[in-house]
Amino acid sequence: GPRGVGKTTSARIFARAINGFEVADEAMAFNVFGLDAASNNKVEDIRSIVEQVRIPPQKGQYKVYIIDEVHMLSQAAFNAFLKTLEEPPPHAVFILATTEKHKILPTILSRCQIFDFHRISVPDAVAHLQNIASQEGVTAEEEALHVIAQKADGALRDALSMFDQLVAFAGKKLTYKAVTEQLHVLDHDTYFTLTDQALASDIPGAMLLFNEVMSRGFDAHHFITGWASHLRNLMVAKDPQTLQLLEVTEDVQSKFQDQSS
C-alpha cells in the first residue's frame, strides 16, 4: 500500500496479537525484529536474520520479523531469503511491507498472504484528527482539519506530523487561517474569486489576483493546478449524484454548488 497508511503499525499490532496481550511489553521486545530494507538490503543483512530465525522465543509463541520497504532488497538478498520463506520454523512469522509490490519477485509473492492497504480518505482522516484533538485538548476548526487531510494526500502519518507541527506553532486553537498560512496553501476563496472574475471577463481583476498570489511566494504551476482542481470540483458539484466526491466541508460544498449553478 501507499506510504503512511499504517502498514508497519498494523504489523506491530499483529505481532502483539498473535503472541497474546498477556505477555509483558518487555518480553515482547525480544520477539519482534524490524529491518529497514532500504538501508539494509545486502545479502549479509538477510543472512543475519536467517541465523536468528533458528532460535525459538523465550516467552510467547512467535518471533515476528517485520521487513519494511522489502522491494529494496537486492536480487541476491531475495534469493538468500527464499529458502527460509519456503520452510520457516514453526515459531517464525515474516511480515513484509512495501509501497511497490510489483517489484517483489513472484517467487516471494507466491509464498505470502497479501493484504492491500489503501490511501486514507479525507473524511476518515478528519475524523481521526478530531478524535486526537479532543483527547489532547486542542480546539480545531473542521475546515482547518480538512486542509491538513487534503495536504496529506491519503497518508495519515503525514497528517499526524502536520497536526503536531501546527499545534506547536499555533497553540491549542487551530484555525483555518493559521493552518493555510503555516502549510502555505491557498484557501478556497482565492479560487472562488478567480472563477467569478473569469466568468465576468474581469481580466484586470484576475491579473491583479494572480500577481498578489505570486507576491506571496506561491508557485505559478501549483496555482494553475489548484484552479484546475477547483474547476473539476465545480463540475462535480453540478450533479447531486457526484456531490459525494467533493472532499470538503459542508460550507465549502454549498459554495461550490452556488458557483456551479
What name fits each language-model region?
Residues 11-16, 45-48, 113-261:
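Extended, largely alpha-helical regulatory/partner-binding modules appended to the mid-to-C-terminal parts
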